[in-house]
Amino acid sequence: MTRKYKRLEELEIWDDFMFGAVMSNKELCKHLLEIILQKKIKDIRYTELQKTIDLQYDAKSIRLDVYVEDDLDSVYNIEIQTTDEKNLPKRSRFYQGMIDLNILNKGESYNKLKKSYVIFICNYDPFGKGRCFYRFENVCVDDPSLKLEDDSVKIMINPYGNDTKQFGKGFVALMDFLKTGQISDTYTETLKDEITEVKVSEEWRRRYMKLLIRDQENIEIGKELGELSTCVRQVKNNLERFSADQLASLLGFDQATIQKIIDSIQIHPDWNNEKIASKLLEERNEHNNTDES
């Protein structure tokens, strides 16, 4: 089944690419954080928009929608979430852990970890409590007044909550904009103008096309990884029954690939099928890149 992509002109604030593009406007991003956190921020800096954190070739990587730091070295990851996959708590834990690992170099003191905020802006109520703002920090279960003070904060925003009135006018205006696109203050008007600018920008069009091409390539890589992982499993199951030549013929892979799989199985008996397949694909891509250069 072919995946259908929106045209740039069809994107809105709830689309990852559009959200990242709009938040590349420093003042808009800073003000969004100020509205959500209800505090003033002197300045922010971008380490890398839609930063990709990929720790190892066999580890799960993540691409962050917006990743910035402020003048106090606090880290902010802001994500748009449009699908209720029932895994947001675990996903937020994973994101925060990956961010921490990315910050801390091997051998560095844990004291170098920065205060981090993982913020999910959802178009649904992630906990079904009717709240528009869910903030989580680690506290002692037996004594809730005792905070762990590990400097990690998780926030989930639900614009459809029924308790917006306890927040400031800017927050209410932002929630209304997220729900309906309604413009009710200067900030939401600027957001709307920025979205319009992105839609007609040739530079953003070029970036969007580049992203679509990369995503399509990743889909192909994922398909290839799945096929190679299946091949590794079949080789493992039949290694004692057939030779490399016979396995190549039976499985439809060239003998060189089968031999590499066999070698990897013997050298790394503790590796699972996907890890072996990932390593083989990595080596092949490195070889292809060397040939091209």
Identify the meaning behind each predicted range.
Residues 103-108, 163-164, 182, 241:
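Short helix-to-loop capping/linker segments positioned immediately adjacent to catalytic or ligand/cofactor-binding
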Residues 130-132, 166-170:
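Short conserved micro-motifs at the rims of enzyme active sites and ligand-binding pockets
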Residues 142, 149-163, 172-173, 177-180:
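Upstream accessory/linker segments immediately N-terminal to the RecA-like ATPase cores of bacterial MutS
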Residues 2-9, 17, 71, 76-81, ...:
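Short, charged alpha-helical interaction segments and adjacent helix-coil junctions
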Residues 32, 36, 40, 160, ...:
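Amphipathic alpha-helical segments in well-ordered regions
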